[in-house]
A protein has these predicted regions:
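Active-site-proximal alpha-helical scaffolds that flank and shape metal-associated catalytic sites
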Residues: 55-221, 251-290, 448-625, 675-682, ...
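Acidic, carboxylate-rich catalytic segments that either coordinate divalent cations
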Residues: 222-283, 631-697
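Extreme N-terminal leader/anchor segments
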Residues: 1-60, 383-446
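Compositionally biased, flexible interaction segments
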Residues: 33-80, 287-322, 328-329, 412, ...
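Aromatic- and Gly/Pro-enriched helix-to-coil junctions and flexible linker segments
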Residues: 275-405
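Substrate-binding/catalytic groove segments of enzymes
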Residues: 193-197, 343, 351-357, 377, ...
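Intrinsically disordered, low-complexity regions enriched in proline, serine, glycine
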Residues: 356-357, 624-626
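Histidine-centered, metal-coordinating catalytic motifs and their short helical/loop contexts
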Residues: 129-133, 212-231, 338-350, 625-645
Length: 697
């Protein structure tokens, strides 16, 4: 059972770095979407989730019978049906909940990794996530827009929506630590109505049922269709946890369930209040000043307001908008007797020093506010502001001793990379290891062509494939290598094959990048490596069965005992460390990752694999792991084809945005990644040959 019973903790230096981040849903939403550049936000994300779990009310908790309920849609906390003004329609509902639609079910993105690749609970959740991701209802907002800072800070969108969206993204980072809560959260997502379900119920007759059928009904059916499988997983998890001595896990699952229900209700309530209770011009102008303050510093060196330099006003964190507004209305910049003659307004006129800073709508708002004397006034239709909520930062429950990852061997580093959820500080070391291998690969290998064209890539792949397959001959007994040698080699390959697919375990992070389509292709390959959640097709599980058939008993990959296994060569960890480290580096090495992926998929084809399959069968050794790679890695429609498509699509996008010269530079990086696989494995290959010559099985 892969679960942590200890509080999540990090080293003190890493925790101190987290104080650079604000602990509110809007900021966290943005930083988690850009996690590869903001790893230090993880302690904030963890505390954010834990704080909301503590605040979840028991009346949202499901009773025990929820695990046996035949009705797939259950509401345990009934809320009044909302009623909205006539101006509110279905697109308005979609716009408000877009962050929720784009982040569901993202909390399951990392449920199946190297650490959990053989865990049946994780595989079951991975399978469920595959179904939930087929939802037909998505927000008509580009991912690139949602990933922008302005989107999460826009006052037209209520903060509780970003709280829930941030929780959905944050849960994904703790699949081991918060597994019980994730199980409960997912069950609630599948059983309870979503925020959009509840909002559209408030539209009443304005939105006809025949429009609802192809949208919400089908999406709800996809969710409810996973309830039975989830109930089975939860029961299995409880049994396993009890057998392992972890105690009762149902209360934690209830908290996760209640978390979804409570935050969903908060979203609906906040949106309903927003639509039902218009805001004032004072609130709107306050939001405008807050927005302008961050970029105004440095432009008003001499100007004074209320006896204080303007730059000092703008430098304050947080910006004191209330005092600023009071000082402004009391200053000589505003003529309350004749607003049109106010020096403040002249600043924004054509040829004025601040012309263009405010648009026409902003100027009308400013005039309305000034005409009301700078006081609270009735609102006319305009954008709506909301106060950004925040959690109280708590002291870290436990800080570990700092680990110097730079001094660790690949064997020792492997454990921390596999368990990076619990050791996020390892990412810096991972980046360093990857950089060293890539640098050496660039020095040792010459790119086959400098100017990229699709036809040249196709020819390159065809040449490699033909070179690999040419010379294959039908097997004739006896085998060239002894059975004992094969058994020993199978054991040595365990760290690599039991981590199969690891290089793509972070591909889901591309969902919010300009390369979403590239990420979809990589995710398809990764899903296949994981058997799409099927234990019979899961590659690590196939290899584990092979090991068992040869009486090779190895600890689970995520344990210290695995990397400490004395039967492994030290260099057996070179390839999995490189690949796992690469997966943790986010989008920084995307072109290199695409090249590595192509090299791996092509390596599963050709006469070597075909001869290996023949000889394994001769020795009556299960060849399933070889068979499956020969089949799914094929050049025509398999993983090699997807790898080629991902490279071509990526380089097309680079060319479109940055031009041909930059595209060619990125092609060089792709090839550098392609070459790096051999570079990373060179020491291991040499050690295998040397040990074979020594042992002579």
């Amino acid at each position: 059972l892969y679960v942590s019973t200890e509080p999540w903790s990090v080293s003190d230096p890493f925790y101190q770095r987290s104080y650079a981040y604000q602990a509110n849903g809007r900021e966290l939403f943005y930083n988690l979407i850009h996690l590869s550049a903001h790893r230090s936000v993880l302690p904030v994300a963890y505390q954010f989730v834990k704080s909301h779990l503590k605040l979840s009310k028991t009346h949202f908790y499901p009773p025990r019978r929820a695990l046996d309920n035949a009705d797939p849609l259950v509401v345990f906390a009934e809320s009044p049906r909302p009623s909205f003004p006539d101006s509110v329609d279905f697109p308005a509902c979609i716009e408000q909940v877009a962050p929720l639609l784009q982040t569901a079910p993202r909390w399951l993105d990392h449920i199946s990794t190297v650490a959990t690749g053989e865990n049946e609970i994780a595989m079951g959740l991975f399978n469920i996530s595959e179904h939930l991701n087929k939802s037909v209802l998505t927000a008509p907002v580009r991912h690139s827009v949602i990933a922008s800072k302005d989107y999460s800070q826009h006052p037209d969108r209520v903060s509780p929506v970003f709280d829930l969206a941030a929780v959905q993204l944050a849960l994904a980072q703790f699949p081991m630590t918060l597994l019980p809560e994730i199980l409960g959260f997912t069950l609630a997502y599948c059983q309870q109505p979503s925020a959009l379900d509840l909002l559209t119920a408030g539209l009443g007759d304005k939105w006809h049922q025949d429009l609802r059928d192809p949208l919400l009904i089908e999406t709800a059916a996809i969710r409810s269709g996973q309830v039975s499988a989830l109930q089975g997983l939860i029961k299995r998890y409880e049994t396993d946890a009890q057998a392992a001595g972890y105690g009762a896990t149902w209360p934690r699952m209830q908290q996760g369930y209640g978390l979804y229900g409570q935050l969903t209700e908060r979203c609906v309530k906040a949106i309903s209040e927003r639509w039902g209770r218009p805001q004032t011009d004072e609130q709107l102008i306050e939001a405008l000043f807050k927005k302008l303050a961050s970029s105004a510093q440095g432009h008003h060196v001499q100007a004074l307001l209320g006896g204080k330099k303007l730059d000092h006003w703008f430098a304050e964190q947080p910006f004191n908008s209330r005092e600023f507004m009071a000082a402004l209305t009391a200053s000589s910049y505003v003529n309350l007797q004749a607003i049109e003659r106010s020096p403040l307004l002249a600043l924004f006129e054509f040829k004025g020093p601040m012309f263009g800073v405010l648009n026409n709508e902003d100027l009308r708002l400013l005039k309305r506010w000034l005409e009301a004397g700078g006081r609270q006034s009735a609102m006319r239709p305009h954008s709506i502001q909301t106060v950004v909520g925040s959690i109280v930062r708590e002291p870290q429950e436990q800080c570990r001793q700092t680990i110097n990852f730079e001094t660790l061997s690949n064997r020792d580093l492997f454990y921390y990379l596999v368990n990076s959820e619990c050791y996020p500080e390892v990412i810096d070391s991972a980046t360093g290891r990857v950089t060293k291998v890539l640098r050496l690969a660039r020095w040792l290998n010459k790119v086959p062509f400098n100017v990229y064209e699709h036809d040249r890539l196709d020819q390159f792949i065809a040449t490699i494939y033909q070179r690999g397959i040419t010379g294959y001959q039908a097997f004739k007994a006896p085998a060239r290598v002894s059975k004992a040698t094969y058994i020993w080699g199978i054991e040595q390959l365990a760290p690599t094959i039991l981590a199969d697919g690891c290089w793509l375990q972070g591909a889901s992070q591309l969902q919010f990048s300009p390369y979403q389509a590239v990420g979809d292709l990589l995710q398809k390959i990764y899903s296949d490596e994981m058997g799409n959640g099927d234990v019979l097709k899961n590659h690590p599980c196939i290899y584990r069965r092979l090991l068992a058939s040869l009486n090779i008993e190895l600890p689970l990959v995520h344990t210290r005992d695995f990397s400490a296994h004395r039967g492994f060569l030290n260099s057996a960890f070179d390839i999995p460390v490189f690949l796992t480290a690469l997966s943790l580096c986010g989008n920084r090495f995307l072109p290199e990752l695409l090249g590595v992926n192509l090299a791996i998929e092509l390596s599963g084809l050709g006469r070597q694999y075909m001869t290996l399959r023949d000889e394994l069968k001769y020795w009556q050794i299960d060849s399933a792991i070889v068979d499956v790679h020969i089949a799914i890695d094929n050049v025509a429609t398999g993983h090699t084809a997807l790898a080629r498509e991902a490279i071509a699509l990526y380089l097309d996008q680079v060319q479109m945005i940055q031009g041909s010269e930059v595209m060619n530079q990125h092609w060089h990086r792709v090839y550098q990644g392609y070459s790096a696989l051999n570079t990373a494995g060179a020491r291991f290959k040499a050690a295998l040959v040397l040990q074979y010559l020594k042992k002579r099985f």
